[in-house]
Amino acid sequence: MASDLAMSAELPNSPLAIEYVNDFDLMKFEVKKEPPEAERFCHRLPPGSLSSTPISTPCSSVPSSPSFCAPSPGAQSGVNPSNPNAANKPQLEDLYWMSNYQHHINPEALNLTPEDAVEALIGNPHHHHHHHQGYDGFRGQQYPGDEMAPSGHHHQVHHHHHHHNHHLRLEDRFSDEQLVSMSVRELNRQLRGFSKEEVIRLKQKRRTLKNRGYAQSCRYKRVQQRHILETEKCQLQSQVEQLKQEVSRLAKERDLYKDKYEKLASRSFTTRESPPQGNPGKANADFFM
């Protein structure tokens, strides 16, 4: 009777928890003697834990079962005899452990619809996050070797990424214009402290850029000279055409002047050979007078 009074004093005032505890019929269960190994395993659990099994996954959505392991004599000996209810406190917490997992209760017992249950589960993301953290911690304790492989892989990836960034920083340290315009002495002074392979690679890049620039300058000069020669050729061809036209014009004028000269020469020759007709008649007239 005293134990019943103590249990009634320690039970919460929530009617849901009281109704859930009253539904249990503990008389139909038989007393089972636990082996010493299981008893020691149960005592290894932390004092505030509610379950000896891993926390349920979000897929199952089933809370962990309470631990009914009997307390060890050493644990009972440390209880203050003036407060006997303190020894029954963990057992009572195991009995109404469902009060802390209200979102796992069957929705039909609360006259809730499945939609209300889904909304209740969605409305508690923080609690599910703690479940995941606990499960991850349990997995980390069971399989400590699994954490070594990802960490080693992350270290290798970080080392490769750092090495690659080192190469990129060295190659991007100088622009193409700086590499081409910089003298060899200045470049050697800037490359102190770097590895030999990186220096050789950068000098090969500089040599390639210089050869490319020299080839481009030669090509540009050739193209520019060809344009100049083509322009001069066009100008000379136009001048030749103009001179040809001038020659043809001068030839026509020469022919014209030649014809005029021939006509004038023929007229003067005919006037010299034939005497004038008016002189003999005048002489005859003078003679008759």
UniProtKB/Swiss-Prot annotation:
It holds the Pfam family bZIP_Maf. Residues 201-226 are annotated as: Basic motif. Its main location: nucleus. It is found in: Nucleus. Keywords: Developmental protein, DNA-binding, Nucleus, Transcription, Transcription regulation. It comes from the Eukaryota. Residues 152-164 have a biased composition (Basic residues). Residues 229-250 are annotated as: Leucine-zipper. Belongs to the bZIP family. Maf subfamily. This is Transcription factor MafA.
